[in-house]
Amino acid sequence: MSQEFTISSGPLPGSEKIYVKGEMFDIEVPMRRINLTPTVDTDGTKIENEPVVVYDTSGPYTDPNYTVDLHKGLPKIREQWIADRNDTVQLEGLSSEYGRARQNDKSLDALRFEHVNTTPRVAKPGHRVSQMYYARQGIITPEMEYIAIRENQMVDKIREAYKKEKGE
C-alpha cells in the first residue's frame, strides 16, 4: 500500500535559511534570518531594522538546495560524530526480543521505512557514552557545539553591533 505525501518545502517568505559554522568541529547549524520591516517613527521617518536570526527547526526541508525524500528520512548528522569518538560498536542487528519480533513480522513490511536503523550502536565495554559523561570529563563534543550555537542564536554578533553603536 503506497501513499503519497505532500510536504511544504523550499524557502519561506520574508526570510532566508543560513548556516552558522562551528569553530571547533565541521558542523553547520541551520538558522533563519528573518527580515523585519522598518519602524515608522512618530514624525513619519522610517528606521531600518536589522534582521533577526533564530534557530530553524524545519530541518533541511526549507533549504532550496535539498531534495526531500520522505522515504529516506532526515540526514543522520550525528552518525559520523558518534563513530569518530570510537567508544561504541555497531551491533549486527536489533538486540531486544521485541525489536527482533517486529522486524521479523512480515505483516508490518508495508509500514517500514528504508532509513530505520536495524544495527544500533552500544557502548564498548568499560565506556560511557552520554553527553553528561563527556562534559564531566571536560570533553566538548560536536553535539555540544551544535547546541551552543543553536541556543546562542548569534548573540555574540548582536553584542558586537551594540558595542559599536555605543562607541565602545
Model-derived segments and spans:
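Non-catalytic terminal accessory/regulatory regions of metabolic enzymes
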Residues: 1-168
